[in-house]
């Protein structure tokens, strides 16, 4: 009888990938990056172990949203004070906080809990084309489609 392979956290080899967000659709990019972060693109994927790779996203300020979402999509947050509900449109987020916009989209597609928090630490998002991770020798990741 064969046993099912279970990856161990200390045996996982992690790669570094660079993803260029210029002209990419927000949700399609986020779902693929979330899959890489979890390790679902590997044959050694184990649901309860962090088997994913590190991802660097550049040009977050040039992300694309389809339809009229730039004006219609609203991001809500609360200050934890009475009457402290704040809102921003996607256009304001892309202009002023492009990194946060991408991080919110990707983290919403990751597991909620200890594993999700651990996985999200491997995500690095930068608004411009420069990133400080040259020493890790990241590979360029081509998105599907």
Swiss-Prot record:
SUPFAM superfamilies reported for this sequence: Ribosomal protein L13
InterPro entries: Ribosomal_uL13, Ribosomal_uL13_bac-type, Ribosomal_uL13_CS, Ribosomal_uL13_sf
UniProt keyword Acetylation, yes or no: no
Tagged with keyword Membrane: no
One GO molecular-function entry: structural constituent of ribosome
CDD domains for the chain: Ribosomal_L13
Disulfide feature: none
GO cellular component, one term: cytosolic large ribosomal subunit
UniProt family annotation: Belongs to the universal ribosomal protein uL13 family.
Subunit structure: Part of the 50S ribosomal subunit.
PANTHER family: LARGE RIBOSOMAL SUBUNIT PROTEIN UL13M, RIBOSOMAL PROTEIN L13
Function: This protein is one of the early assembly proteins of the 50S ribosomal subunit, although it is not seen to bind rRNA by itself. It is important during the early stages of 50S assembly.
Protein name per its UniProtKB record: Large ribosomal subunit protein uL13
